[in-house]
């Protein structure tokens, strides 16, 4: 036996442990390589907008995340120096499979290569309190865990009916469904393509449901070194991250 599928590894490990590579010790990289654009959508769940004290936007809020923030789904998340407000956001990632320019909403999903889990890690002080654009609070190293899998549209079905969740130290903070998006995947692809061409390998991170640290009551809760995050989306797999301080 020369090749193993991950879904059969537990069985193989039991049957032939002396011949199976210890796959659990292997780093899994991001599920998309050579990402051109990393596009994010802000306040795209109505209840998330409410918890942040912001109104529902009349059009999608678009911002960029540096591609250098992308890392594997189980890599450590590094809290930047001088950060006290690093936060979590589980999001549905949409990966473009063929160029989209001025596409209509009806055909927009034809341009999707697949879907994945993204943790849109955010530093709220850098993002909100330091003036300017959001990009500096969204683009720190390791602030874009992506994967584990890139799942094709035929396997996913309706992208507007997927459960997504996130836990910190085994406590569930986010528990939502993509059906409550303000702007669905097809509309986002259509909308973005009116302003610039979407190319193969571009990622759209479609926003997060309520339950982020910023929205916790009676006061916000932020990540600390030594904590763990576990997050996932129905049909797309699970991520696991340790939170560490920048050295």
Model-predicted segments: where are they?
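Structural signature of FAD isoalloxazine-binding scaffolds in flavoprotein oxidoreductases
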Residues: 55-73, 86-88, 223-235
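Catalytic-pocket segment enriched in acidic/His residues
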Residues: 27, 31, 48, 54, ...
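N-terminal non-catalytic cap/leader segment that marks the start of a structured domain
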Residues: 1-60, 228-230
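N-terminal accessory regions of nucleic-acid-interacting proteins
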Residues: 101-116
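Short helix-loop capping/hinge motifs at secondary-structure junctions, enriched
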Residues: 100-103, 155-157
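Short, structured patches in soluble enzyme cores that scaffold and shape functional sites
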Residues: 65-67, 74, 81, 88-98, ...
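Generic beta-strand structural signal
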Residues: 36-39, 59-61, 75-77, 84-92, ...
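Short catalytic-site patches enriched in acidic/histidine residues
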Residues: 61-80, 100-101, 142-151, 210-214, ...
């Amino acid at each position: 036996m020369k090749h193993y599928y991950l879904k059969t590894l537990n069985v193989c490990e039991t049957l032939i442990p002396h011949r199976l590579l210890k796959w659990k010790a292997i780093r899994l990289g991001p599920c998309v390589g050579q990402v051109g654009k990393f596009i994010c959508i802000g306040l795209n769940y109505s209840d998330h907008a409410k918890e942040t004290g912001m109104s529902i936007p009349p059009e999608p809020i678009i911002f960029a995340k540096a591609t250098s923030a992308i890392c594997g789904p189980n890599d450590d998340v590094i809290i930047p120096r001088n950060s006290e407000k690093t936060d979590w956001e589980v999001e549905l990632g949409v990966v473009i499979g063929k160029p989209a320019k001025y596409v209509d909403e009806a055909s927009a999903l034809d341009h999707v290569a697949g879907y994945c889990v993204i943790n849109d890690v955010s530093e709220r002080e850098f993002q909100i309190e330091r003036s300017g654009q959001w990009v500096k609070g969204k683009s720190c190293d390791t602030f874009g865990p992506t994967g584990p899998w890139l799942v094709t549209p035929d396997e996913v079905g309706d992208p507007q009916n997927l459960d997504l969740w996130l836990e910190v130290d085994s406590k569930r903070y986010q528990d939502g469904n993509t059906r409550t998006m303000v702007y669905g995947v097809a509309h986002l692809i259509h909308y973005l393509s009116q302003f610039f061409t979407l190319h193969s390998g571009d990622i759209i991170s479609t926003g997060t449901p309520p339950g982020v640290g910023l929205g916790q009551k009676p006061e916000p809760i932020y990540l600390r070194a030594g904590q763990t995050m576990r997050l996932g989306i129905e049909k797309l797999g699970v991520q696991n991250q340790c939170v560490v301080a920048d050295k």
